[in-house]
Amino acid sequence: MLLRPLIAALLAVAFPALAAAPDAATLEKIDRTFADWRLSAHAPGLVYGVVADGRLVHVKGLGVQDTATKTPVTPDTLFRIASMSKAFTALAILKLRDDGRLSLDAPAETYVPELKGWRYPTTDARKITVRDLITHTAGFVEDNPWGDRQQVLSEAEFTRMLADGVPFARTPGLAMEYSNFGYATLGRIVANVSGATYQDYIRREIMAPLGMASSGYDVLASPQDRRALGYRWQDGKWVREADMKDGAFGAMGGVETSASDYARWVAFLLSAWPARDDPEAGPLRRATVREIVEGANYPAAPMRRAGVSATPCRQAMTYAMGWQVIQDCELGRVVTHTGGYPGYGSIVLLLPDAGVGVFAFASRTYGGPALPAWRAALLLEAAGALKTAPLPVSPGLATAYEAARDVWRKGEITAAPLANNVLLDLDAAAWRRRLAALRTEVGACAAGEPVTATSAMEGTFTWTCEHGRLTGRVQRAPTPAVTLQALDLSVAPP
């Protein structure tokens, strides 16, 4: 495969525009936030980056790769990213689905025959599906940090584990409970369906097309002079964590990558928004990538991580496909995942509606830099460096809005093409009285301001009038011809 043309095409796609590039003062605050965290967290090495408009706009390495050699961390230093690896496995499954090679709703035993003899916790339990494994709803027990230490398990040992079966925490499909074992099983599905190891499949089908040449799973084969070695902080000093070789559980947490490589991954994911008519330019379709934010039906409502800001913030959160999806009170939709591993901690925040991502990798056991990453995102938001791209006004919405203007100018609801519900909900005479009352209160309105689309079928507007402002909403009916099913008008507060 010719990588350069594909990468160039990927980076040339349209991204939602930032309100403004991060200014020097904001970047200085972000740098200080990460630097302070590294010292307080006793992380030997740290690298972080900000991706916007399809490129790495800011990246910085702090500390050292190796406490003995004092080699400084750079954007090309290799870190293990632990559970942030799950996103690669999830997209590998979705790619195989797109290629017609598996079904998300098929029993997992269809692709892993060792599961066929399993004993389920209740007689009315349905069989585990591939989708259950992706969304952590298979009924397995939460297995941190047991799962991390299974990294070195051989494929033969994993086969025996699968054949023996595992105890269930609950019946499949009843709740979300995080399972590294489940994602290791997805790795086996990738291997069985593709005919390659999951490592080779993900490198060939996802990493290589994105130009992630330094990324992979086998840390013992990586350039050792570029690796950030893992440490734990114990008794006031750094203690080297032993490297765990690649194994069967790597599908849940085995990826090693650099900031330079990972920025390509983040840019690719963000390029899936907004939905548009542009040619496809990546290893998976944009619509497939957007599936990662479709959460399972087990929402939570936690408070935002303590220490991120002085403002309390309750979030809505669910787990989707290799990602947590959060609705934040300040940042809006955030697609995120952390990684914790012996010797490493990591986090990524995607703000898909703004086309911006923040990520960070550290070389301390379970020392994930979530706190400074969230603070960095809030600093970008406060600086006006995040902006949701406006939706285009569809031709049908433009026609509906012009009809709403005609209603106002003529004082008659029947001046617009109406869906059959409108006059049943409020007759023409009542509409006439309502419009007249509004005109008496606000006077003449030029109605020249544009409509703001909230979808292809609906929009809002504000008109400046002689004695105030009028706000409104216009909504098309789901009919082939443009008809209005709703027109709301009200006087804006002073």
What would you call each of these model-derived segments?
Residues L62-T67, Y120-G340:
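Short, surface-exposed loop or secondary-structure junction motifs
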Residues D36-Y48, A68-L133, A169-F181, G250-G253, ...:
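Short active-site loop at a secondary-structure junction
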Residues P22-F79, R101-S103, E114-W118, E155, ...:
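Short, conserved catalytic-motif segment at the N-terminal edge
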Residues T452-P494:
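Exposed beta-sheet edge and beta->alpha loop/turn motif
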Residues A14-P16:
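N-terminal signal peptide c-region/cleavage motif recognized by signal peptidases
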Residues E412-T454:
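Short solvent-exposed beta->alpha transition segments
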Residues P299-R305, G332, A360-A430, P494:
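Short, gly/Ser/Thr-rich active-site loops of penicillin-recognizing serine hydrolases
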Residues I347-L350, A354-R364, T471-R473, L484-L489:
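Short, well-ordered beta-strand elements
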